[in-house]
Amino acid sequence: MSEDEKLPQVIMDPADYEALKKRLDELEKKVENTNAELFQLAGKKVGRDIGILYGLVIGIILSYILPALIKIIQILSLKVLVQQ
């Protein structure tokens, strides 16, 4: 900062200053809580989307595996019936 610029100075009653600090702290807490809630909602949406994606992938994998698995079970059950 150059010497030309001077910081503004304010003379204030200490009690008013403390009251102002308390009010600013309360406002800061409200802003932090609001931001936390917004991030939590965004996290829930992302989690839901990831869950849907996992469900689709597992469903697609099972749609390919289950018919083959059913055929294998049928073949094995026929072999068991033939041997008896």
UniProtKB/Swiss-Prot annotation:
Its EC number is 7.2.1.4. Keywords: Cell membrane, Membrane, Methanogenesis, Methyltransferase, One-carbon metabolism, Transferase, Translocase, Transmembrane, Transmembrane helix. It comes from the Archaea. It catalyses: 5-methyl-5,6,7,8-tetrahydromethanopterin + coenzyme M + 2 Na(+)(in) = 5,6,7,8-tetrahydromethanopterin + methyl-coenzyme M + 2 Na(+)(out). InterPro entries: THM_MeTrfase_su_G (IPR005866). GO terms for cellular component: plasma membrane. Pathway: One-carbon metabolism; methanogenesis from CO(2); methyl-coenzyme M from 5,10-methylene-5,6,7,8-tetrahydromethanopterin: step 2/2. The complex is composed of 8 subunits; MtrA, MtrB, MtrC, MtrD, MtrE, MtrF, MtrG and MtrH. Belongs to the MtrG family. This is Tetrahydromethanopterin S-methyltransferase subunit G.
